[in-house]
Amino acid sequence: SKFGSLSSQSSSVDTSSQNSNLGLLNFSKLAHLDGLLRQKQSCPTIIFMHHPPISLSNSEPPEHEYENFRMIENFAEIVDRHPQIIAFLCGHIHRAFSSHINASPVMVTPPPAKRLCRGAVDHAKMPEVAFRLHSFKENAFKDTTVRDC
């Protein structure tokens, strides 16, 4: 893809854990990401990851989706060193959510399908099915959420 006259790159970060469904960003994963980002510092980069790397609330302690909050802090330190990151695309929480890390948007995609449940289901409590369409336009990252009617 193109970003102005520069090529862009995407990088996927494995946030899975063998211990729980919470995210894991250990030293090895963070060092690998940092190394990849150092290789192409002038190349606009989109980071794909399952667990959103941000606090999801204003509560104390903060609600997050990682085994411990320090993992998010360590990730943020790496992000601070790499201004070429233009967006973070995530999932996991099954609802649309947007935030920022520095100037880069963090976009959480809502579920592409309703959950398959056995027994009676209250569909009013389920998130809307949706998808996001991402594009570059006029040297900016654009995001549009399109919902199923």
Where are these regions (language model features)?
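Active-site-proximal beta-strand elements of phosphoester/diester hydrolases
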Residues: 2-17, 46-48, 105-110, 145-146
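Feature marks short, surface-exposed loop/turn motifs that line or immediately flank catalytic pockets
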Residues: 17, 53-55, 115
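His/acidic metal-ligating clusters that form di-metal
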Residues: 21-105, 141
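Binuclear metal-dependent phosphoesterase catalytic core
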Residues: 78, 96-149
